[in-house]
């Protein structure tokens, strides 16, 4: 513990009490400075967190009241630095930052209520921008009401303070696994702040801030002993970051910040790609829906339609999807697909596309394997029978444009009729301009196949679709034609002097473009390209007529080539399979070696980490024990000194004995306590005597007061009784008069209404007959709705019970598998115990034989007569027939003798 301060003891409770005293006398700034000095001091690192938390909370309250945002931010950073190694330090940090945001929001609400003004984006464009002299002069000379300016002066500072508080808290909580939950909650609060107050500039800064936090997480090099680092391999962590990015995407779309929305989409896609767990279908559907809106704003109709296609694929699988919603989204998908224009006529696939990288990026955002096209989207709509869900007007438009014959001169009338039906729906109406552009481009492409020169008025008349809200003017149609030429959809020139349009045809350069548009007749380019193929067909037919065996030879040659190709293919397939097997085996061996190497390295690192952590823990424990002992000793001495000083001050306060506070070394606490007790006894005796005299005096005085006031109390009671009787009579008369008046008015009203009864009865009968059929129809509709609800309820309960049955069966299957695993483990354990018992018996038998052999070898040798030599065969027959044990063989081997 740190040494005592020269003015007051360095203890949290003393500082807290000092701050409360300063607040009580109105010195809030001084109290804030006192708390700030304690929180930022390094001496609090070894104090208990529960002692520091109330001080930090009081500091935050004062900082919010005084609007000291920078001081609160510095204090929170230092507080986190000092307590983060404690047991509950980070939990305390979370409590304090939540309190900080809560107080700031409360102050903003109070300022709004006091000013009674609704915050608008137009008032302050940027909360972080400083006021310029021009803005101050402009506000001073403006015609705005002074009350409005006062209201904004009350609200805007707290709005700016809350924004700074959110940024500071996010900076404190970032990149710490134990603070993830609170970090996510504060991020959501910041999003709601930007949405509620329409803060577009602040939302952009917030997104950049979060993007920087995420980048620091993904690029950080995680050291061996790093504490509380963010682990992106954890599914819950990744899901939490995904939820944040999806919320960011939704808010950016609501604020119509489309560039920020696209960046948010990129962030979401990066997290989805890095995540090992697939996100929920609801989140992905929301992702594709917002992506479609972004593409619609950017004017990219192809990827807008592709995004709606992905969205509809997910939405139609939802069990909560209704028929109306399916029809709505299917109609939007078909309209978006039909709005995609035909491919540009000058888009040659042999030439590198300038937008290849961009298209690849957009394709990856939609999780597609290849770049979408209009034809693939149309085929998808037809193959999945999406047209069965769409609105009849949209289905009619699809039939007119894709299934019926597209005639340039009659298509305008058909499309106009369908557009009039589509305009009734505000969601469908927004696709009419893009549909008009796509239809006119296709119309002019087919006109260019028939005519070489036409009048400009003729083309303009074909492009004006009348009867719709979005009908184009002549100038707009001409502008569309020029843009079509610029984008490569059309090839023509306009002579404004003669109002003649020349439709160009390049037979040697348009080989690729004819397949992109529907053909009305054979074009010159096709005639030029087909000459060689026709000549080859004619020569082949002539050769067959001249030489009849030519076809036989060709067929024979083809069969031999096919036979050789099949044989070579089988051989090559076998070689490829063998090569693949060899490569897989090498890869498996290399992977195994690498895995073993990694496991060994990981084991060594783990052992080193364990040893290092153990040594560090021992060092920390020893250091902590030493500090605790020193702390206890200092506290013991400090308590003694404080107690001695306190007793001396109390004795001096009595005024009977005067002690020198600077010279108390000769006195101990026992002597001072005895002196204090004597003084207290004396004071107690004096007080009792004074109280006795005062009590007797008060008794006599009270008795005299009561005797004197008795005569006045009787008079007052009589007067009160008379007043009550008068009030009662007055109230009674008022009630009677009011009742008579109400009765007379009721009788008069009855007489007036009695005259209209003969007219009311027939009128009531007519009304009842008029609405009887409508009432019956409403009852019928209500009954039908009830029956439909019953059927839906029955189906839902049926599905629910089926799901419960499947879950129960799955649970029983898993239980059976667990029982089987336990049984097999028990059998293996029994088998192992039996083998162990047999091995122990063998070892015991071997030990017994070894002891017997040792005993036999220790016996003294007795002299025996030399036997006569016997034949080798007889000697061999005389040997015992029992085989040697393993122990005997090993003993003979050590002695250098053969074991058999």
UniProtKB/Swiss-Prot annotation:
Region (Disordered): 808-883
Composition bias, Basic and acidic residues: 808-853
GO BP annotations listed: formation of cytoplasmic translation initiation complex; translation reinitiation
Name the UniProt record assigns to this protein: Eukaryotic translation initiation factor 3 subunit A
InterPro entries registered for this protein in UniProt: EIF3A, eIF3a_PCI_TPR-like, PCI_dom
Any one GO molecular-function label of the UniProt entry: mRNA binding
Keyword DNA-binding: no
Coiled-coil annotated spans: 96-129, 551-859
